[in-house]
């Protein structure tokens, strides 16, 4: 039995003694111990593909901060890599895929990878982390969203214009839907395998959903998020594994995401939580949504913004703080001060206590 189940209770909108907190990219370059591990390993991919290293890095922030969850150390591009698109990282530029998808012929050659073969290192990491956590806090597994993965798979990496995928959306939408359906199948299998290996909550990162117009979002992102929420087997009762759908720029679609079948919606800092809570109408828990740049502020300023965020959620939720998971609106960045993270966690714990 979990010693700390606040996260799972909050995601189910049950009563908790205080608002739980975890942070996107809580294991990352802002931590000196992470940088030391990265230097010793020699590459990001070696860390992500070696279960013992992935476990160590996952646990690093838990040793520093009294967080309410661990999140698997990995990368959303492990699925495209396992599909044969040859993931590599270029220093200072980020991830690149050596075999981008540009036509229907390439899509027909894609297959959903075997989760205990091509992606066994991820599942072994999940199993090892669960063992090392020893039921102290829940472990979150994750995947990129179909749209976000397709962006990388078609562009071959990050992009400012997303010209290739947007051209495909306008000129060959059936081809893009074919890719999105294949990727959705892979995401569902990937998350199910993480759950089977021991993940106790799951999150989908729709990082690039916000680049789409409303019509395009409702055509190329939302239907596939909904498929995941409705088709991913998550169990019942004490064996239930809650799902969070997080997206940058998803504010206009919260009401629709709340009806997708997910347990929770993660939002960025471009919408007030009060507004998000009203739009979700009590159908889902909400996760977020402190601007990550707040961590560049003083501890007093951080505490002030924590209070404002907590109050904003309650104002939109009938005065109640239940059903809220505190998080940033996006991930930690390398220049952040670990002491300011400590101040953030302390403020959330102190100010949210019931």
UniProtKB/Swiss-Prot annotation:
MF (Gene Ontology): uroporphyrinogen decarboxylase activity
Keyword Heme appears in the UniProt entry: no
GO CC list: cytosol
CDD domains: URO-D (cd00717)
Statement: the UniProt record of this protein carries the keyword Lyase: yes
Residue ranges that the Swiss-Prot or TrEMBL entry lists as coiled coil: none
Any single Pfam family the record assigns to this protein: URO-D
Biological function: Catalyzes the decarboxylation of four acetate groups of uroporphyrinogen-III to yield coproporphyrinogen-III.
Oligomer status and interactors: Homodimer.
Protein's recorded name: Uroporphyrinogen decarboxylase
